[in-house]
Protein backbone atom coordinates (compact mmCIF):
# COMPACT_ATOMS: atom_id res chain seq x y z
CA UNK A 1 0.00 0.00 0.00
CA UNK A 2 2.08 2.86 -1.29
CA UNK A 3 1.61 6.37 0.09
CA UNK A 4 1.37 9.39 -2.17
CA UNK A 5 4.51 11.46 -2.51
CA UNK A 6 4.57 14.83 -0.75
CA UNK A 7 3.71 17.84 -2.90
CA UNK A 8 6.05 20.83 -2.62
CA UNK A 9 5.30 24.45 -3.51
CA UNK A 10 7.93 27.18 -3.39
CA UNK A 11 7.17 30.82 -2.61
CA UNK A 12 9.67 33.39 -3.87
CA UNK A 13 9.74 35.14 -0.47
CA UNK A 14 10.42 33.98 3.05
CA UNK A 15 7.31 33.02 5.00
CA UNK A 16 6.19 31.90 8.44
CA UNK A 17 2.38 32.45 8.46
CA UNK A 18 0.09 29.58 7.44
CA UNK A 19 -3.57 28.73 8.00
CA UNK A 20 -6.14 26.37 6.56
CA UNK A 21 -9.16 28.16 5.11
CA UNK A 22 -11.36 27.23 8.06
CA UNK A 23 -14.77 27.97 6.55
CA UNK A 24 -14.01 25.97 3.37
CA UNK A 25 -14.85 22.33 4.02
CA UNK A 26 -15.25 21.16 0.41
CA UNK A 27 -11.95 22.20 -1.17
CA UNK A 28 -8.51 21.64 0.35
CA UNK A 29 -7.20 25.18 0.67
CA UNK A 30 -4.42 26.86 2.64
CA UNK A 31 -3.40 30.52 2.95
CA UNK A 32 0.26 31.54 3.26
CA UNK A 33 1.53 35.01 4.17
CA UNK A 34 5.01 36.20 3.12
CA UNK A 35 7.72 38.14 4.94
CA UNK A 36 9.66 40.45 2.65
CA UNK A 37 11.32 43.71 3.66
CA UNK A 38 12.12 44.79 0.08
CA UNK A 39 8.98 43.89 -1.87
CA UNK A 40 5.22 44.05 -1.40
CA UNK A 41 4.10 41.10 0.66
CA UNK A 42 1.61 38.58 -0.63
CA UNK A 43 -0.97 36.06 0.46
CA UNK A 44 -0.82 32.87 -1.57
CA UNK A 45 -4.07 30.92 -1.83
CA UNK A 46 -3.04 27.30 -2.25
CA UNK A 47 -5.64 24.92 -3.67
CA UNK A 48 -4.71 21.25 -3.53
CA UNK A 49 -6.18 19.00 -6.21
CA UNK A 50 -6.36 15.68 -4.40
CA UNK A 51 -7.18 13.56 -7.46
CA UNK A 52 -4.24 14.75 -9.53
CA UNK A 53 -1.91 15.36 -6.58
CA UNK A 54 -1.11 18.90 -7.72
CA UNK A 55 -1.35 22.49 -6.50
CA UNK A 56 -3.15 25.48 -8.01
CA UNK A 57 -2.29 28.85 -6.58
CA UNK A 58 -3.40 32.45 -6.74
CA UNK A 59 -1.70 35.47 -5.25
CA UNK A 60 -3.16 38.51 -3.50
CA UNK A 61 -1.18 41.61 -2.57
CA UNK A 62 -0.79 42.47 1.11
CA UNK A 63 1.10 45.74 0.88
CA UNK A 64 0.54 46.65 4.55
CA UNK A 65 3.73 44.87 5.63
CA UNK A 66 5.45 41.56 6.37
CA UNK A 67 2.99 38.98 7.73
CA UNK A 68 3.67 37.33 11.09
CA UNK A 69 0.32 35.63 11.64
CA UNK A 70 -2.68 34.76 9.47
CA UNK A 71 -6.06 33.32 10.41
CA UNK A 72 -9.28 32.57 8.50
CA UNK A 73 -12.83 33.35 9.60
CA UNK A 74 -14.78 30.22 10.65
CA UNK A 75 -17.95 31.60 9.04
CA UNK A 76 -16.93 33.43 5.85
CA UNK A 77 -14.24 31.90 3.67
CA UNK A 78 -13.48 35.27 2.05
CA UNK A 79 -12.54 36.94 5.36
CA UNK A 80 -9.19 36.66 7.14
CA UNK A 81 -7.00 38.46 9.65
CA UNK A 82 -3.29 39.19 9.49
CA UNK A 83 -0.76 40.50 11.99
CA UNK A 84 1.87 42.50 10.13
CA UNK A 85 4.83 44.76 10.84
CA UNK A 86 4.51 48.47 10.28
CA UNK A 87 7.29 51.03 10.77
CA UNK A 88 6.24 54.34 12.22
CA UNK A 89 8.47 57.02 13.75
CA UNK A 90 11.50 54.73 13.57
CA UNK A 91 9.88 51.95 15.60
CA UNK A 92 8.31 48.74 14.41
CA UNK A 93 4.79 47.94 15.56
CA UNK A 94 2.96 44.71 14.77
CA UNK A 95 -0.58 45.69 13.76
CA UNK A 96 -3.64 43.57 12.97
CA UNK A 97 -6.41 43.97 10.43
CA UNK A 98 -9.43 42.15 9.00
CA UNK A 99 -9.44 41.68 5.20
CA UNK A 100 -11.70 40.37 2.47
CA UNK A 101 -10.55 38.53 -0.64
CA UNK A 102 -11.86 39.74 -4.01
CA UNK A 103 -15.05 37.76 -4.78
CA UNK A 104 -13.60 35.91 -7.79
CA UNK A 105 -10.67 34.57 -5.73
CA UNK A 106 -12.28 33.40 -2.51
CA UNK A 107 -13.74 30.24 -4.07
CA UNK A 108 -10.61 29.25 -5.94
CA UNK A 109 -12.43 29.33 -9.29
CA UNK A 110 -9.72 31.34 -11.02
CA UNK A 111 -9.11 30.34 -14.64
CA UNK A 112 -5.38 30.87 -15.06
CA UNK A 113 -3.52 30.80 -11.76
CA UNK A 114 -0.18 31.66 -13.36
CA UNK A 115 -1.41 35.10 -14.43
CA UNK A 116 -2.19 36.07 -10.86
CA UNK A 117 1.51 36.37 -9.97
CA UNK A 118 2.03 38.99 -12.66
CA UNK A 119 -1.06 41.06 -11.89
CA UNK A 120 -2.04 40.21 -8.34
CA UNK A 121 -5.11 41.85 -6.90
CA UNK A 122 -5.10 43.55 -3.52
CA UNK A 123 -6.99 42.44 -0.44
CA UNK A 124 -9.85 44.70 0.61
CA UNK A 125 -9.29 46.18 4.07
CA UNK A 126 -12.40 45.74 6.22
CA UNK A 127 -11.08 47.23 9.45
CA UNK A 128 -8.02 47.67 11.63
CA UNK A 129 -7.89 46.17 15.11
CA UNK A 130 -6.56 49.43 16.50
CA UNK A 131 -3.77 48.60 18.93
CA UNK A 132 -2.10 51.98 19.26
CA UNK A 133 -2.84 51.96 23.00
CA UNK A 134 -1.85 48.34 23.61
CA UNK A 135 1.37 47.66 21.67
CA UNK A 136 2.35 44.97 19.18
CA UNK A 137 -0.05 42.15 18.31
CA UNK A 138 1.14 38.56 18.69
CA UNK A 139 -1.87 36.88 17.09
CA UNK A 140 -5.59 37.14 16.32
CA UNK A 141 -7.90 34.25 17.23
CA UNK A 142 -11.41 33.74 15.81
CA UNK A 143 -14.14 32.36 18.04
CA UNK A 144 -14.17 28.61 17.27
CA UNK A 145 -17.25 27.53 15.32
CA UNK A 146 -18.54 31.09 15.72
CA UNK A 147 -20.40 33.34 13.31
CA UNK A 148 -17.29 35.35 12.47
CA UNK A 149 -18.35 38.24 14.71
CA UNK A 150 -15.87 37.83 17.59
CA UNK A 151 -12.08 37.75 17.65
CA UNK A 152 -9.44 37.94 20.36
CA UNK A 153 -6.11 39.65 19.86
CA UNK A 154 -3.10 39.28 22.13
CA UNK A 155 -1.14 42.55 22.26
CA UNK A 156 1.96 42.71 24.49
CA UNK A 157 0.39 41.85 27.90
CA UNK A 158 -3.25 42.53 26.94
CA UNK A 159 -6.08 40.16 25.99
CA UNK A 160 -8.53 42.11 23.81
CA UNK A 161 -11.95 40.71 22.88
CA UNK A 162 -13.36 42.43 19.79
CA UNK A 163 -16.84 42.57 18.30
CA UNK A 164 -16.86 42.85 14.52
CA UNK A 165 -19.86 44.81 13.26
CA UNK A 166 -21.52 45.54 9.93
CA UNK A 167 -19.80 42.96 7.71
CA UNK A 168 -16.59 43.31 9.74
CA UNK A 169 -16.31 46.97 8.68
CA UNK A 170 -15.85 48.08 12.27
CA UNK A 171 -14.21 46.49 15.31
CA UNK A 172 -14.85 47.55 18.90
CA UNK A 173 -13.27 46.19 22.08
CA UNK A 174 -16.01 44.58 24.17
CA UNK A 175 -13.76 43.50 27.06
CA UNK A 176 -10.11 43.16 27.95
CA UNK A 177 -7.71 41.76 30.52
CA UNK A 178 -4.14 42.64 31.42
CA UNK A 179 -1.36 40.31 32.51
CA UNK A 180 0.11 41.73 35.72
CA UNK A 181 3.51 40.91 37.18
CA UNK A 182 7.18 41.79 37.33
CA UNK A 183 9.18 42.69 34.24
CA UNK A 184 7.97 43.19 30.70
CA UNK A 185 5.32 40.53 30.29
CA UNK A 186 4.42 39.65 26.73
CA UNK A 187 2.12 37.02 25.25
CA UNK A 188 3.74 34.69 22.70
CA UNK A 189 0.78 32.50 21.75
CA UNK A 190 -2.85 31.78 22.52
CA UNK A 191 -5.71 29.44 21.71
CA UNK A 192 -9.46 29.93 22.08
CA UNK A 193 -10.96 26.76 23.55
CA UNK A 194 -13.76 25.16 21.49
CA UNK A 195 -15.23 23.75 24.74
CA UNK A 196 -17.31 25.30 27.57
CA UNK A 197 -19.38 27.31 25.06
CA UNK A 198 -16.19 29.03 23.89
CA UNK A 199 -15.80 30.90 27.19
CA UNK A 200 -12.16 29.96 27.82
CA UNK A 201 -8.81 31.01 26.43
CA UNK A 202 -5.30 29.68 26.99
CA UNK A 203 -2.28 31.97 26.61
CA UNK A 204 1.47 31.55 26.76
CA UNK A 205 3.94 34.10 28.07
CA UNK A 206 7.59 33.28 28.69
CA UNK A 207 7.56 29.78 30.29
CA UNK A 208 4.00 29.98 31.67
CA UNK A 209 0.60 28.87 30.36
CA UNK A 210 -2.51 30.61 31.68
CA UNK A 211 -6.22 29.93 31.36
CA UNK A 212 -8.75 32.76 31.19
CA UNK A 213 -12.52 32.92 31.66
CA UNK A 214 -13.75 35.26 28.93
CA UNK A 215 -16.99 36.07 30.78
CA UNK A 216 -15.21 37.66 33.73
CA UNK A 217 -11.89 38.24 31.89
CA UNK A 218 -10.12 36.69 34.87
CA UNK A 219 -7.38 34.08 35.17
CA UNK A 220 -8.58 30.58 36.07
CA UNK A 221 -5.33 28.60 36.12
CA UNK A 222 -1.62 29.16 35.69
CA UNK A 223 1.02 26.53 34.86
CA UNK A 224 4.07 28.47 36.06
CA UNK A 225 7.02 26.64 34.51
CA UNK A 226 5.21 24.68 31.83
CA UNK A 227 8.41 24.56 29.76
CA UNK A 228 12.07 25.12 30.61
CA UNK A 229 12.22 27.89 28.02
CA UNK A 230 9.78 30.04 26.03
CA UNK A 231 6.38 28.48 25.19
CA UNK A 232 5.82 28.82 21.42
CA UNK A 233 2.39 27.33 20.74
CA UNK A 234 -0.72 25.76 22.26
CA UNK A 235 -3.62 23.66 21.04
CA UNK A 236 -6.73 22.21 22.67
CA UNK A 237 -7.75 18.60 22.20
CA UNK A 238 -10.97 18.94 20.12
CA UNK A 239 -12.61 15.94 21.83
CA UNK A 240 -11.38 16.11 25.46
CA UNK A 241 -12.37 19.38 27.03
CA UNK A 242 -9.64 19.67 29.68
CA UNK A 243 -6.70 18.56 27.56
CA UNK A 244 -4.16 20.96 26.11
CA UNK A 245 -0.88 20.47 24.20
CA UNK A 246 2.04 22.91 24.35
CA UNK A 247 5.47 23.19 22.78
CA UNK A 248 8.49 25.39 23.30
CA UNK A 249 12.15 26.28 23.02
CA UNK A 250 13.13 23.42 25.36
CA UNK A 251 12.48 21.10 22.34
CA UNK A 252 9.59 19.45 24.20
CA UNK A 253 5.91 18.88 23.52
CA UNK A 254 3.80 18.52 26.66
CA UNK A 255 0.22 17.44 27.28
CA UNK A 256 -1.76 18.91 30.15
CA UNK A 257 -4.98 18.19 32.00
CA UNK A 258 -5.83 21.72 33.15
CA UNK A 259 -7.62 20.33 36.23
CA UNK A 260 -4.30 18.91 37.50
CA UNK A 261 -1.57 21.31 36.48
CA UNK A 262 1.23 20.27 38.83
CA UNK A 263 2.76 18.08 36.13
CA UNK A 264 2.10 17.19 32.49
CA UNK A 265 0.15 14.07 31.58
CA UNK A 266 2.79 13.22 28.97
CA UNK A 267 5.94 14.71 27.48
CA UNK A 268 7.52 14.16 24.05
CA UNK A 269 11.18 14.88 23.33
CA UNK A 270 11.54 13.99 19.66
CA UNK A 271 12.77 17.32 18.24
CA UNK A 272 16.35 18.57 18.49
CA UNK A 273 15.58 22.31 18.36
CA UNK A 274 12.78 24.74 19.24
CA UNK A 275 9.26 23.46 18.57
CA UNK A 276 7.20 26.22 16.95
CA UNK A 277 3.85 24.61 16.23
CA UNK A 278 1.63 21.88 17.69
CA UNK A 279 -1.70 20.81 16.16
CA UNK A 280 -4.29 18.20 17.10
CA UNK A 281 -6.16 16.55 14.25
CA UNK A 282 -9.70 17.99 14.20
CA UNK A 283 -11.40 14.56 13.95
CA UNK A 284 -8.97 12.00 15.36
CA UNK A 285 -7.37 13.58 18.42
CA UNK A 286 -4.77 10.82 18.76
CA UNK A 287 -3.00 12.31 15.72
CA UNK A 288 -0.72 15.21 16.58
CA UNK A 289 1.59 17.28 14.37
CA UNK A 290 4.62 19.22 15.57
CA UNK A 291 6.96 21.49 13.59
CA UNK A 292 10.41 22.61 14.64
CA UNK A 293 13.43 24.63 13.63
CA UNK A 294 15.27 21.30 13.39
CA UNK A 295 13.58 21.44 9.92
CA UNK A 296 11.37 18.43 10.67
CA UNK A 297 7.65 17.79 11.01
CA UNK A 298 6.67 14.86 13.23
CA UNK A 299 3.34 13.01 13.23
CA UNK A 300 2.67 11.29 16.57
CA UNK A 301 -0.04 8.81 17.49
CA UNK A 302 -0.87 9.78 21.09
CA UNK A 303 -3.56 7.19 21.50
CA UNK A 304 -3.18 6.61 25.28
CA UNK A 305 -4.34 10.16 26.08
CA UNK A 306 -6.87 10.41 23.25
CA UNK A 307 -10.65 10.16 23.42
CA UNK A 308 -10.36 6.54 22.16
CA UNK A 309 -7.47 4.99 24.14
CA UNK A 310 -8.71 1.47 23.38
CA UNK A 311 -9.44 2.07 19.71
CA UNK A 312 -13.03 1.41 18.62
CA UNK A 313 -14.82 -0.34 21.47
CA UNK A 314 -17.38 -2.97 20.57
CA UNK A 315 -20.52 -3.04 22.69
CA UNK A 316 -20.74 -6.24 24.78
CA UNK A 317 -24.35 -6.69 23.66
CA UNK A 318 -23.11 -7.09 20.11
CA UNK A 319 -21.08 -10.15 21.11
CA UNK A 320 -23.40 -13.06 21.67
CA UNK A 321 -20.64 -15.68 21.96
CA UNK A 322 -19.06 -15.74 25.48
CA UNK A 323 -15.71 -16.88 24.01
CA UNK A 324 -15.69 -13.89 21.73
CA UNK A 325 -16.55 -11.78 24.75
CA UNK A 326 -13.49 -13.05 26.63
CA UNK A 327 -11.25 -12.38 23.65
CA UNK A 328 -12.67 -8.89 23.37
CA UNK A 329 -11.80 -8.23 27.03
CA UNK A 330 -8.23 -9.31 26.34
CA UNK A 331 -8.15 -6.92 23.43
CA UNK A 332 -9.12 -3.93 25.57
CA UNK A 333 -5.53 -3.08 26.44
CA UNK A 334 -4.72 0.58 25.81
CA UNK A 335 -2.98 1.01 22.47
CA UNK A 336 0.62 2.20 22.50
CA UNK A 337 1.72 5.76 21.73
CA UNK A 338 4.19 6.01 18.88
CA UNK A 339 5.90 8.30 16.40
CA UNK A 340 4.25 7.54 13.06
CA UNK A 341 6.37 9.54 10.64
CA UNK A 342 9.10 12.13 10.53
CA UNK A 343 8.79 14.35 7.46
CA UNK A 344 12.08 15.77 6.23
CA UNK A 345 11.20 17.65 3.02
CA UNK A 346 12.16 21.01 4.55
CA UNK A 347 15.68 22.44 4.65
CA UNK A 348 14.96 25.40 6.94
CA UNK A 349 13.11 26.08 10.21
CA UNK A 350 9.51 24.88 10.02
CA UNK A 351 7.44 27.59 11.67
CA UNK A 352 3.92 26.34 11.00
CA UNK A 353 1.97 23.15 10.40
CA UNK A 354 -1.81 22.95 9.85
CA UNK A 355 -4.35 20.20 9.21
CA UNK A 356 -6.67 20.71 6.25
CA UNK A 357 -10.19 21.87 7.17
CA UNK A 358 -11.63 19.69 4.38
CA UNK A 359 -9.61 16.44 4.56
CA UNK A 360 -8.71 15.08 8.03
CA UNK A 361 -5.83 13.00 6.62
CA UNK A 362 -3.96 15.83 4.92
CA UNK A 363 -1.77 18.64 6.28
CA UNK A 364 0.56 21.41 5.16
CA UNK A 365 3.81 22.66 6.68
CA UNK A 366 5.74 25.86 5.96
CA UNK A 367 9.44 26.60 6.40
CA UNK A 368 11.07 30.02 6.50
CA UNK A 369 12.64 29.67 3.05
CA UNK A 370 9.12 29.76 1.57
CA UNK A 371 8.71 26.03 1.04
CA UNK A 372 5.18 24.70 1.58
CA UNK A 373 4.87 20.91 1.76
CA UNK A 374 1.58 19.00 1.61
CA UNK A 375 1.65 15.53 3.17
CA UNK A 376 -0.80 12.85 4.22
CA UNK A 377 -1.23 10.51 7.15
CA UNK A 378 0.13 7.10 6.02
CA UNK A 379 -2.64 4.96 4.52
CA UNK A 380 -1.95 2.00 6.79
CA UNK A 381 -2.57 4.13 9.89
CA UNK A 382 -5.62 5.78 8.34
CA UNK A 383 -7.29 2.41 7.73
CA UNK A 384 -6.25 1.13 11.16
CA UNK A 385 -8.04 4.10 12.75
CA UNK A 386 -11.11 3.83 10.51
CA UNK A 387 -11.64 0.06 10.41
Swiss-Prot record:
Region called Disordered, residue ranges: 309-337
BP GO terms, sorted: endocytic recycling; protein ubiquitination
Subcellular location: Golgi apparatus, trans-Golgi network
Main localization category: Golgi
InterPro entries (UniProt xref): EIPR1, WD40/YVTN_repeat-like_dom_sf, WD40_repeat_CS, WD40_repeat_dom_sf, WD40_rpt
Sequence ranges of Acidic residues compositional bias: 315-326
Gene3D superfamilies referenced in this protein's UniProt entry, alphabetically: YVTN repeat-like/Quinoprotein amine dehydrogenase
WD repeats: 132-172, 182-222, 226-266, 270-310, 345-385
PROSITE patterns: WD_REPEATS_1, WD_REPEATS_2, WD_REPEATS_REGION
GO cellular component entries: Golgi apparatus
Keyword Repeat: yes
Keywords: Golgi apparatus, Repeat, WD repeat
Classification via Pfam families: Beta-prop_EIPR1, WD40
Biological function: May act as a component of endosomal retrieval machinery that is involved in protein transport from early endosomes to either recycling endosomes or the trans-Golgi network.
Similarity annotation: Belongs to the WD repeat EIPR1 family.
Protein name in UniProt: EARP-interacting protein homolog
Organism annotation: Danio rerio (Zebrafish)
Amino acid sequence: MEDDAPVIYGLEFQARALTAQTAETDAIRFLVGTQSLKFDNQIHIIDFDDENNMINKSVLLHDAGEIWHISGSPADKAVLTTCYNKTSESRVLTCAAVWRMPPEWESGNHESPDDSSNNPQTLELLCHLDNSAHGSMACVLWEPMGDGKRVISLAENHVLLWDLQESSAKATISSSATLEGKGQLKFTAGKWSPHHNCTQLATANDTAIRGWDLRSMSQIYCIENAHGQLVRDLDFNPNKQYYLASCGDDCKVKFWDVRHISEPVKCLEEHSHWVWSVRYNHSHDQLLLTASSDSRVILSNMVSISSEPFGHLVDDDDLSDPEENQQEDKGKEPLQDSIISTYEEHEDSVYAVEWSAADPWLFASLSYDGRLVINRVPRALKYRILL
